[in-house]
């Protein structure tokens, strides 16, 4: 099965933060599924659009997008919606059998719904 997985704050074990979506995606890959993760690259000073990497068999699409809790409320909203729009375009151009979206933020539902509609595939929304 081809899975398009959306998680704005995806981390690998080498990164600080939760790795639940990594563990789920890795398990799916180990079971023979294809997983394309759409996420953000929050590395400071790393700008330039999208980059792609292979993380233990998970094809990860990283969008350079500045974000921190120190941003103003408006700037955080802009970051959430920038990711929603960019990931909608990215995911809509991929091939998949299902779209799986993990919140937070809840705005992850926007690209998930768009990709599901555009590709006519089911959606799983994990809160």
Q: Residue locations for each model-derived region?
A:
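N-terminal subdomain of nucleotide-sugar transferases
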Residues: 1-59
């Amino acid at each position: 099965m081809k899975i398009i997985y959306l998680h704005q704050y995806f981390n690998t074990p080498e990164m600080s933060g939760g790795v639940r979506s990594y563990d789920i995606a890795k398990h799916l890959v180990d079971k023979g599924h294809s997983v394309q993760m759409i996420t953000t690259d929050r590395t400071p000073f790393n700008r330039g659009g999208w980059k792609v990497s292979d993380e233990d068999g998970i094809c990860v699409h990283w969008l350079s997008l500045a974000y921190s809790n120190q941003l103003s409320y408006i700037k955080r909203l802009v970051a959430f919606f920038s990711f929603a729009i960019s990931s909608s375009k990215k995911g809509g151009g991929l091939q998949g059998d299902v779209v799986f979206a993990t919140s937070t933020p809840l705005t992850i539902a926007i690209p998930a719904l768009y990709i599901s509609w555009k590709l006519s595939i089911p959606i799983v929304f994990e809160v």
